[in-house]
């Protein structure tokens, strides 16, 4: 038996066609059901759908064998006890520093609003920039407007939301996309089956 963890929401919509091309189909009635473990067209493969931030947790602890998670989640929560085996090239965006002007970034101690605390801390430490990180779970663009922060660190896709709120992306931190990850122990114990799936998914990219 092979178990795969997928993310809810936008990533799932882009993941399902990819998996179908690789030979794995989840029926609509399964997706719309209240079941926590979903059946697929293959009797030896089950799927679990969870919040994006929980995907690496399930895979790291061996609750599932494989998973598909955003690089932003892997950077933030760590990637211990799992292998990142494929960049799937879906749900693409960039993790960036944005502010109202370049001058706002010229501070002795920069106030940064973000939900990506660990990634932000690493980035500014590497730059040698002192910063105070203010963790927010949403409405990031509001922080500079109301004086809560000098800048934000967030995912940028088209940049339209930033522009609508008077923010400009100035500094690039990381390219983000969905990645296929595998539990280290599962890769040893189910090597042939997992390698076959990695190949199938790679061929469908």
Swiss-Prot record:
Localisation: Cytoplasm
Glycosyltransferase recorded as keyword: yes
Catalytic activity line of the entry: 1-(5-phospho-beta-D-ribosyl)-ATP + diphosphate = 5-phospho-alpha-D-ribose 1-diphosphate + ATP
Gene Ontology biological-process entries: L-histidine biosynthetic process
Keywords from the named record: Amino-acid biosynthesis, ATP-binding, Cytoplasm, Glycosyltransferase, Histidine biosynthesis, Nucleotide-binding, Transferase
Pathway info: Amino-acid biosynthesis; L-histidine biosynthesis; L-histidine from 5-phospho-alpha-D-ribose 1-diphosphate: step 1/9
Any GO CC annotation of this UniProt entry: cytoplasm
Protein role: Catalyzes the condensation of ATP and 5-phosphoribose 1-diphosphate to form N'-(5'-phosphoribosyl)-ATP (PR-ATP). Has a crucial role in the pathway because the rate of histidine biosynthesis seems to be controlled primarily by regulation of HisG enzymatic activity.
Domain notes: Lacks the C-terminal regulatory region which is replaced by HisZ.
UniProt subunit comment: Heteromultimer composed of HisG and HisZ subunits.
Listed name of the protein: ATP phosphoribosyltransferase
Gene giving rise to this polypeptide: hisG
